[in-house]
Amino acid sequence: QIGNHIFDMVDAVAAKEQKKALDYYYDLLTLKEPPMRILYLLTRQFRILMEVKEMDRTGVPPKEIAAKVGIMPFLVGKYRTQAKAFTRKELRGIVEAGVQTEEDVKTGKMGDILSVELFLVQYSSKREK
């Protein structure tokens, strides 16, 4: 269940559907999922997208992509689709922001619930043209 919510949350971020991304987050909080676990899973998901995008760009076959990133082969297509919504630079920035957000919480600079909220708001906002 949490995996589906995380995947859906990333879809919402990719589509710049901020309300939907936050709704999934609040659903997970209601289900008593710790904010830091949610952040970890989101960051992991974006890291996988970054790896899939890079391997896809260099022509790595789907089965090999699945083996290298640790996902089921039938999921490669879904990850490719999600990855297309982002540039490599955006994915790298999101992963770095996830790591920084986790550090900010662990060092007491930010509260856990708010920090994940801000992370989602930042990356699900409409892009400036």
Which residues does each predicted region cover?
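C-terminal capping/gating helix-and-loop segments adjacent to ligand/active sites or protein-protein/ligand interfaces
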Residues: Y79-M110
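Small-residue-rich helix-loop
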Residues: Q1-E90, R127-E128
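Residues within well-formed alpha-helices
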Residues: K20, A97-Q100, Y123
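Short, charged, intrinsically disordered terminal tails
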Residues: K109-K129
